[in-house]
Amino acid sequence: TPDGTERWVEMRIPIEEGRQYRLGEFEFEGVTVPTEEIVRAQFGLEEGDYYNESEVRDGIERLQLLYGASGYMEFLAFPDLSPRDQRVDEDGREVPTDGPAIVDVIMRAEEGDQYFVNRITFTGNRTTRDYVVRREFRLLEAGVFNSNALTTSVRRINQLGYFLPIQDDDITVDQVEGDEFQVNIE
């Protein structure tokens, strides 16, 4: 406040919890690279479990890591929820019904394309020879791009202690002009 005194405000927000939903059918659409069993294991959800949005988000993050390790750096996934206790009326609005509190989930995935490393370039290295830094790098030119290996490489280079700490956003991964499935790393 202008006079320097502290004042407190008490807020009361009424919350009315809705129904607690259980997971019904849990299907995957657009998944072709790993098996459905491997993809399903990333979520840790079984039919009949209580639906948990944070577990779904965590599962999507684990899927992004799984796909990123296989060169699919543009992978996207999003859940499509269909509660069984609602229907859509003629105006397109969801209307509650007396159905069970069960939600069916279709995980829609867009895998994108698999990328390969074209060229790895180190810039700003005036401390040591290029091969010293290159041997700490876990990606190889002409190999499949692996986002997990890139993160490990940054950590290993930082552990050398020769340079100021490198952050993940200091590394650029650019698509090679004219070759849609190749990337350069600098």
Could you describe each region identified by the protein language model?
Residues 1-186:
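Periplasmic polypeptide-binding modules associated with outer-membrane biogenesis and secretion
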